[in-house]
Amino acid sequence: MRTIIYTSNTGSTAEYAQLLGKELNLPVHSLQQAKNKVPAGSEIIYLGWIMAGGIKGYKEAAKLYKVRAVCGVGMGQTGTQLKEVRDKNAIPQRIPLFTLQGNFDVKKLHGVYRFMMNVMVKTAGKGLANKTDRTLEEDDMLDMIINGGKRVSLQNLKAVTEWYKSIN
């Protein structure tokens, strides 16, 4: 059974999982739901949200299932931070890794995550705002920090869908 399994915090990862499931015609379950519906050892594509470089739920999913690809959803632009995310999560080189830019709304975060992001918004936002030679990626990050932003799109999944279609 091939399935998309995800862990989401504010909804971006769930939104990507649903878009990908529709595009690839695969069932989609949260990691919690999957424990009761998807047999251990099944082949999956795992999507998780990124916090400080860590993909939430990946280690648990990797213990339960045969992870065939990983998508990390965070604030960075799609396709960036691949080495850092792979290293931090100990994702084997044989497993394709994709990073996807999600939405950002600090009000949707809860508890310690909200506190941490409020601190990050103040410190990183101030640092980026004062920087005179920002890159396009830094301009985009600053815009998200200041104004929030919706970045989930089917276009961001293009590399994932191309990979999947190339192996099937």
Could you say what each language-model-derived stretch is?
Residues 102-128:
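Short, solvent-exposed beta-strand-terminating loops
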Residues 22, 60, 83-87, 114, ...:
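Charged/polar, solvent-exposed surface patches and flexible loops
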Residues 11-14, 79, 106, 154:
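Loop/helix-junction capping segments adjacent to catalytic residues or to phosphate/diphosphate-binding pockets
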Residues 119-168:
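Glycine-rich phosphate/pyrophosphate-binding loop and the adjoining helix
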Residues 32-112:
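Helix-loop-strand module that forms the ligand-binding subsite of alpha/beta enzymes
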Residues 1-64, 162-168:
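N-terminal beta1-alpha1-beta2 submodule of the flavodoxin-like/Rossmannoid cofactor-binding fold
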